[in-house]
Regions:
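Central hydrophobic cores of alpha-helical transmembrane segments in multi-pass inner-membrane proteins
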Residues: 1, 29-43, 61-63, 84-94, ...
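Short juxtamembrane and helix-loop transition motifs at transmembrane-helix boundaries
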Residues: 14-19, 34-48, 153-156, 180-188, ...
């Protein structure tokens, strides 16, 4: 699909969207599952406290996941990936029990750690692409291998980004936040496991592996 630029900071760094085959599949899956999860959430949260606030973040999470689906490059993916942390944290701690607060803290700490890893990995890549015609746009098959001047550093950048984006996909050894998140309301755990967060993590890793690096 055609790339749609929202904000261009300078050449090679922009926030932009593009709808390709992989984005269509992921956004389509989310768009089918989300209304079903929402119908259940309405029933489950009928007598819950602060219900309007809960559903505000619930809906915001949907918009953010679509932003992840349509991200045209690593910078846009990173932005929405971090927004996903901020939008889902209130959903986890909503009951305000001791267990849910603990789950929220661990989720936030691990997410911030992953954010730092992904950020440094992305900065490495932006340094490599500076002054070249190669961008961090997602291209089928990847194009960053063309930055052949320092393959060791390129692999290190990939490792950092992979581990950073991998936090939300609950890959070992940063997986233990997911069982703890069971203290959240059931619609939230459905969101974390089946619809939004873990799937977004896997989607980000697939983008990184098959559409940025070869």
């Amino acid at each position: 699909g055609e790339k749609f630029v929202i904000i261009e900071f300078f050449k090679g760094l922009d926030i932009s969207f593009k709808l390709d085959g992989m984005g269509k599949i992921f956004s389509g899956m989310v768009s089918v599952l989300w209304p079903l999860a929402t119908l259940y959430a309405f029933s489950y949260m009928e007598h819950a406290a602060k219900k309007p606030v809960y559903f505000m973040f619930y809906t915001l999470t949907y918009a953010i996941v679509l932003g992840i689906s349509f991200s045209a490059n690593m910078e846009t993916l990173y932005l929405f990936y971090e927004c996903l942390t901020l939008a889902t944290l209130p959903l986890i701690i909503q009951p305000m029990t001791k267990q849910s607060k603990k789950a929220g803290r661990i989720y936030m700490y691990l997410s911030l750690f992953g954010s730092a890893l992904a950020f440094f990995g992305m900065m490495f890549l932006l340094k490599f692409t500076d002054g070249t015609e190669i961008s961090t746009d997602f291209v089928s098959g990847g194009n960053l291998i063309l930055l052949s001047q320092d393959q060791e550093s390129l692999r290190f950048a990939y490792f950092l980004a992979f581990m950073g984006f991998g936090v939300k996909s609950a890959i070992f050894p940063m997986h233990f936040w997911l069982p703890l998140a069971g203290a959240a309301p059931t619609p939230t755990t459905a969101l974390l496991h089946a619809v939004a967060v873990v799937k977004s993590g896997v989607f980000a890793l697939m983008r990184l592996t098959y559409f940025a690096f070869p």
